[in-house]
């Protein structure tokens, strides 16, 4: 179903009138206006970490965006390499697919044992852990601060902005 949806949306954004005959959607001569300002269309970021998401990204995506997953940088890189291989097999330029991800993060006051599948630790530990994503080629890293109470979450974000981000700038 998602593959059909991505194909339909992409075509609606780029073609004047479309017809579609699929397993889940069937229609004739449909138009969509206004068209997006972005050319050729709004970028499509495909989420998910499994083979179906890899194939979907390779065929339709402008970015692979595994969201909210427990995954090591090495596993993430292997997934992206697979996306690029599949894109090449589909006749697309694999370098045109952006390497992105979303990770959970927690800034602590005391050092904690490190696990490459989790971003948790002091600012110093996080700088080191986050550099691993840069080293494997991630171009966009979204962070989800995993603290349940709002005031604590604000503190996490502020600490990250002041104590971690300055060390990640080129």
Q: Where in this protein do the model-derived segments appear?
A:
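Active-site-adjacent structural elements that line small-molecule/cofactor binding pockets in enzymes
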Residues: 1-170
């Amino acid at each position: 179903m998602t593959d059909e949806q991505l194909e339909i949306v992409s075509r609606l954004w780029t073609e004047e009138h479309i017809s579609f005959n699929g397993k889940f959607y069937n229609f004739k001569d449909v138009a969509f206006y206004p068209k997006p300002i972005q050319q050729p269309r709004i970028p499509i970021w495909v989420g998910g970490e499994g083979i179906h998401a890899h194939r979907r990204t390779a065929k339709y995506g402008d970015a692979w965006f595994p969201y909210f997953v427990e995954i090591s940088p090495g596993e993430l890189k292997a997934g992206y390499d697979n996306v690029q291989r599949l894109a090449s097999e589909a006749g697309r330029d694999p370098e045109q697919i952006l390497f992105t991800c979303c990770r959970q993060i927690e800034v602590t006051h005391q050092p904690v044992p490190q696990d490459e599948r989790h971003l948790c630790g002091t600012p110093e530990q996080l700088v080191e852990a986050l550099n691993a994503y840069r080293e494997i080629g991630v171009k966009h890293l979204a962070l989800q601060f995993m603290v349940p109470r709002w005031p604590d979450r604000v503190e996490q974000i502020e600490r990250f902005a002041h104590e971690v981000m300055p060390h990640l700038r080129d």
